[in-house]
Amino acid sequence: MSACKSFAPIADEQSRILILGSMPGIKSLEQQEYYAHPQNRFWRLLALLLQEDVPQDYAAKQALLHKHQLALWDTLGYCEREGSLDSSIKNEAPNAVVELAGELPHLQAVVCNGGKAAAAIKKYFAKRMPEQVQIFYLPSTSPANARLRLEDLAERWQVILQFLA
């Protein structure tokens, strides 16, 4: 088992939506970038939904988030895990998600990217979220969720567009 620690959130006071994963995978931890695995569809999905070009470097990815008032973090701050699969997570500790939500004055929605993020939200945070924040449980963009095509993910994830200016 390897000890894994999440990154700092990408957020600013204009953020309207907080997208939460579970814990960065091995490739992301190695590169110190959210959703760094080339087969993860997160960045391609956002680009499709937002009608933008797929960002090619991490600075452009962060700029895309800020431009569209999106924040990004993980539900877990620490865990032990062999490999990258959420099903291997043990000894988890949550991030301060409710506290971050309270620091984002325009936050309207929290989006869980996948089942483990959804389970962590329900376990640790859902009852303590600010009243105006809606929570959405959406399918994972992970390559492990190969049963859904990018177009299928976009159909489910388009719910976020209602919160964007």
Name each model-derived stretch.
Residues M1-R16, H37-P38, L85-V98, K122-A165:
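C-terminal capping/extension of enzyme domains
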Residues K67-A117:
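Internal catalytic-core helix/loop-beta-alpha segment
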Residues R16-S22:
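Short, hydrophobic/glycine-enriched beta-strand segments
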Residues K27-S88:
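Short, surface-exposed acidic-centric catalytic microdomains
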Residues S22, D74, P139:
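Pocket-edge structural micro-motifs
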Residues I26-L29, E80-G83, A118-I121, P143-R147:
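Short catalytic/ligand-binding loop motif for oxyanion handling, primarily in non-cytosolic enzymes
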